[in-house]
Amino acid sequence: MYGYGYTPAVVAPTVMSFSFVPPQAFQQCWFYSLYTQIQQAQLYEMQSWFMRVDANRSGTISSGELQYLNIGGTPLGIETATKLIKVFDHNKNGQIDFYEYAALHQFINNLYRCFVANDRNFSGTIDANEIYNALITSGFQLPFPTVNYLFLKLSPSGYGLLFTQFLNLCATVALTRSLFEWNDPMRTGVVHLNLAQLYDIIALV
């Protein structure tokens, strides 16, 4: 697990009232497979972090709270946090519960492993070709021209992306996937959108 951390005001730990078995609706989401990869010991660690952040005991956290998640000593930031909230917020209430957070956390862990594996020259950055390979490893099959376009949006000069930038790119891809699935409840692989719905998707991404 990459160096995550969060240091809000200390809140006395309490036992959360839910089990680690997520609701049925959550199990229908593409990111449920991420949740199933997590060992129970890791779930307890994630639960502890979640409880510290959820200071008002609402059972959910917002992008304003998630932005302080540290990645190698660097906070996630509000832009990426907001995008990730949208990816994993399957009930679209603008916040994420513990199950959604755990899947999000595993998503970041997996992406970091892919980033390291594809940073073959140990520069701390990866280029468009390496990003293309990392996305395939992460389960996202995108044409290379699309990957290159996303890469140049974040790095117009063509310089390699840092992990936080790579995570932002992957969050965009994952959000697009979530928005597609929400409009494809029968999982046919095809969606029919009117212009207003397309505008909504563009606004969210």
From Swiss-Prot:
One of its GO terms (molecular function) is calcium-dependent protein binding. The keyword RNA-binding does not apply. Its main location: cytoplasm. It comes from the Eukaryota. Ca(2+) 1 binds at D54, N56, S58, T60, E65. GO terms for biological process: sorocarp development. It is found in: Cytoplasm; Membrane. It is a peripheral membrane protein. Keywords: Calcium, Cytoplasm, Membrane, Metal-binding, Repeat. Disruption phenotype: Cells lacking pefB and mutants lacking both pefA and pefB grow normally in axenic medium or on bacterial lawns, and have no major differentiation defect, apart from the fact that mutants lacking pefB have a stalk base thicker than normal. One of its GO terms (cellular component) is cytoplasm. Ca(2+) 2 binds at D89, N91, N93, Q95, E100. InterPro entries: EF-hand-dom_pair, EF_Hand_1_Ca_BS, EF_hand_dom, Peflin/Sorcin_CaBP. Pfam families: EF-hand_7. The keyword Cytoplasm applies. Gene3D superfamilies: EF-hand. In contrast to pefA, does not form homodimers in presence of Ca(2+). May form heterodimers with pefA. This is Penta-EF hand domain-containing protein 2. It comes from Dictyostelium discoideum.
